[in-house]
């Protein structure tokens, strides 16, 4: 049984993720972390989650805290704290401020808990996964970003609806930045084991429109609901369960590249990775068509530039 700490637990994503994580059979303690001025909210959230556990007849310990000692010993540290996007903002607009928040909470974690796994959710997630890796001192396999996991699921739903099949029949991935330069990997997408481009009705599927819908999903939710909540929370729960139960599933997350894909190095970006109890067990090499690789390299360039700016910003603080 494991302890999971959620930093930024009073936010939309953090609170919802905490409630869902507490229901996992592999989790026996969830620690809710927020700033000291939010301690009353933490108390209320704790009570609410305990009520949900009672209704589900699940036994788990829910603790609250505002200090490093409250979360640094967790098996998995889920980082959701940060300034959220406002209407009209891109995720990259949040880089410098949120990089400072990552540094505040995660700097030197490896010195106190070298076995911790950090899951970064805060945007821009690819950039901040790299920041978390560098400031925490943890090895590259133990720092993971939510990345394009949810984007891939959104794309999967659109394909399933178009071909009128169950989602489980669709295998697809979106790689690259969790943002405007994300890349759909059509060349390895299949429906019921059949390459998607050979499916009847493929010619009627507008890939560009589908990708645009995936890209704009978060912004539309911000404009109408105020911000993403349930989708990211479930995606977090999926990843934490996969890690703690050592499921060894291949999921698309933001992970550190060291030459595994076309020799690309020193960047955290959305790629297929095999996940288990030690975090990233393997970056799964993926064969891309020439146009997909060009698009992926463009995405890498964007993320690397934003990452450079983030690292410079935190070095000045």
From Swiss-Prot:
Binding positions for substrate per the UniProt entry: 85, 91, 123, 154
Xref: InterPro entries: L-lactate/malate_DH (IPR001557), L-lactate_DH_AS (IPR018177), Lactate/malate_DH_C (IPR022383), Lactate/malate_DH_N (IPR001236), Lactate_DH/Glyco_Ohase_4_C (IPR015955), NAD(P)-bd_dom_sf (IPR036291)
GO molecular function annotation: L-lactate dehydrogenase activity; L-malate dehydrogenase (NAD+) activity; L-malate dehydrogenase (NADP+) activity
Coiled-coil boundaries: none
Binding site residues for NADP(+): 8-14, 98, 121-123
Superkingdom in the source lineage: Archaea
UniProt-listed GO biological process terms: lactate metabolic process; tricarboxylic acid cycle
Annotated catalytic residues: 178
One Pfam family cited in the UniProt record for this chain: Ldh_1_N
Keywords: NAD, NADP, Oxidoreductase, Tricarboxylic acid cycle
Documented EC number(s): 1.1.1.299
Reaction it catalyzes: (S)-malate + NADP(+) = oxaloacetate + NADPH + H(+); (S)-malate + NAD(+) = oxaloacetate + NADH + H(+)
Family indicated by similarity: Belongs to the LDH/MDH superfamily.
PANTHER family documented for this protein: L-2-HYDROXYCARBOXYLATE DEHYDROGENASE (NAD(P)(+)), L-LACTATE DEHYDROGENASE
Physiological role: Catalyzes the reversible oxidation of malate to oxaloacetate.
NCBIfam families (alphabetical): PRK06223.1
Protein name as annotated: Malate dehydrogenase
Organism: Methanopyrus kandleri (strain AV19 / DSM 6324 / JCM 9639 / NBRC 100938)
Higher taxonomy: Archaea, Methanobacteriati, Methanobacteriota, Methanomada group, Methanopyri
Gene responsible for this protein: mdh
